[in-house]
Amino acid sequence: MKIVRTVHEWQQLQKSFQGKSLGFVPTMGALHEGHMALVQNSVSDNDVTVVSIFVNPTQFNNPDDLENYPSTFEQDVSNLNDWKVDVLFFPEANELYPDNFAFSVDENKDSLALCGLDRPGHFKGVLTVVMKLLNIIQATRAYFGEKDYQQYRLIQNMVACFFMPTEIVGVPTRRDREGLALSSRNLRLSPEELTTARKVNKILSSETLSAEVRREKIENLGLKIDYLEERWGRRFIAAHIGSVRIIDNVSLGEEETIK
């Protein structure tokens, strides 16, 4: 696996991949089996797979979240090699933001709901960095997990609206044996908090509970709910367990077409 740090270095390397399909998996590191599922899809679908690791500072509302975001770079590199990744793009912040975030991408509809309500500016940071990465990598396909379904929806719409050629592929959420959605943030949960978090998906997925009872059961676990609602044919939750914010969603069977 080659590791490249600059846009220029990638552009030179990219010339050797002409005529080949290119899959791209953008990440912020702290890789787990959920990321592995994205990579496996890319390796299966494409001739070449590129993974980026970049902890994007512009999508964090809370400076403590940025400072405390887990970093496991050496293990990440080992995993990427095991997963048969061809290239790791690992830029510094000033490489992707030479303008110091003077230019940005805003969406004024779907980004204002759910996570957008509690994290103003978050999706501006996400969409801006993803547009930059897609323009840099010029991939045939890019892969995003459905755990972050709102993000996936926004990125797919952005790519369509700006006539970008990369196909955006959604990959179903990877979960542990007890149903907890895999997330880098899970590393920050204590054993007791993990036990609590694993109970949330069962409540979220239940079709026998009313909305009121579902909320009550989750609050009785000690979680502080940011939102618990249904839209786009899915049921969404964001809640705090201690200092850690977790999100999840489940399909209700008839999902609204992304457009």
Task: Give the positions of each predicted feature.
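Phosphate/ribose-recognition catalytic cores of enzymes acting on nucleotide-derived substrates
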Residues: K217-K259
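Nucleotidyltransferase catalytic core that binds NTPs
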Residues: K2-E216, N220, R231, S243
